[in-house]
């Protein structure tokens, strides 16, 4: 894995506008950063990214299978007891999964380490699957990277294939909250993939969802919604006043309810419990287990429900705070994880996001930040394969 500087396309702003990339600049700061690129070899991708992703995903599914049968685990995950049975039903029925993203730290000379798995509401999808590929095509044409360079990126192909597998005569709704450019772009991109698969689809904001007679979900025209993709956390749905309606299983939500186990950072200590010493895992503990942290060991404290680095704190071996990100999750239960430093290139720390569609590892996106904690504003940097 090497990083090097490359020229920025002179008409980047226009290209972004033409492709609906409305957030390539966030708060007057660069988000999409194509002034540099990461180069990987095919062997690195296949052996160090793709293979571990596939193996870890299967391990995660084993955790789900154990968790739905174990009330102690569900309690540790802070999932409300009201939903235990319906989550187990969702898993036994093998309700559909669409996609997820594993976040890795990789220094290049040791196995990747899994930091967390967002299997419910992962973003940076549009950038990884679509806009990054446009950059690759332009970069090859202009000669700034080898003309035979490739990219670890079959995400869009797999998404379209997955929507073909999920095809139904009923409209597939796609929804997110209002006033979120990134979420809307992600959802519209997924809707486009569904349409390419031949699926009738409709967009609606979460705020515009209604309830009909008997508690059925409806759109603005009072049509009953039977299937919907939502870029809205499952734990928020469970805490909503209408959350108990999930137990009736009237609608098919994507992501499915069983994925609430995988999008929970409590997954990390469970993986360590069931697969201790695995080379791609970091030692991790629940709140009641933190006495197992070795004296002098640096560690990270994370809320079990947290997004975009919110309320993550890094401690050194003397329990001094090394870095902290503010957020809205300070009251959540915490997990503790052995600290794995991100590789540093210049002034930037680099995180690899490895994408999974259904059960298949299929692509990658790279984020950079000037701090050790990756956040929603962390820069997205393209990659390519050569050699």
Residue ranges with predicted function:
Residues 1-387:
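Preference for protein termini
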């Amino acid at each position: 894995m090497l990083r090097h500087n490359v020229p920025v396309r002179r008409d980047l702003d226009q290209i972004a506008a033409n492709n609906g990339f409305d957030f390539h600049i966030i708060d007057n700061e660069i988000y999409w950063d194509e002034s540099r690129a990461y180069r990987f070899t095919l062997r690195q991708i296949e052996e160090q990214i793709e293979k571990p992703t596939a193996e870890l995903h299967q391990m995660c599914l084993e955790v789900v299978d154990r968790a739905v049968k174990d009330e102690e685990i569900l309690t540790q995950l802070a999932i409300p007891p009201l939903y235990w049975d319906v989550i187990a039903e969702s898993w036994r029925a093998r309700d559909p999964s669409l996609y997820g993203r594993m976040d890795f730290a990789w220094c290049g000379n040791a196995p990747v380490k899994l930091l967390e798995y967002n299997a419910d509401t992962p973003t940076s999808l549009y950038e990884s699957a679509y806009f990054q590929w446009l950059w690759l095509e332009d970069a090859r044409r202009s000669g700034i990277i080898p003309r035979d360079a490739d990219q670890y990126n079959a995400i869009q192909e797999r998404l379209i294939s997955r929507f073909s597998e999920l095809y139904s005569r009923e409209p597939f709704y796609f929804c997110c909250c209002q006033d979120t450019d990134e979420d809307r772009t992600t959802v519209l991109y997924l809707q486009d993939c569904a349409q390419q698969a031949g699926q009738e689809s409709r967009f609606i904001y979460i705020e515009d969802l209604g309830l009909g007679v008997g508690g059925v979900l409806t759109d603005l025209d009072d049509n009953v919604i039977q299937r919907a993709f939502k870029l809205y956390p499952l734990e928020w749905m469970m805490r909503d006043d209408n959350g108990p309606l999930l137990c009736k299983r009237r609608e098919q939500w994507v992501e499915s309810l069983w994925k609430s186990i995988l999008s929970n950072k409590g997954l990390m200590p469970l993986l360590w419990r069931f697969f201790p010493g695995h080379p791609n895992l970091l030692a991790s503990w629940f709140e009641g287990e933190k006495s197992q942290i070795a004296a002098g060991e640096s560690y990270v404290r994370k809320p079990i429900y947290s997004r975009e680095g919110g309320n993550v704190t890094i401690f050194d071996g003397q329990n001094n705070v090394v870095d902290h990100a503010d957020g809205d999750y300070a009251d959540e239960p915490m997990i503790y994880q052995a600290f794995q430093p991100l590789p540093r290139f210049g002034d930037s720390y680099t995180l690899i996001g490895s994408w999974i569609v259904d059960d298949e590892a299929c692509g990658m996106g790279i984020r950079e930040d000037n701090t050790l904690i990756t956040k929603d504003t962390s820069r997205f940097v393209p990659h390519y394969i050569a050699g």
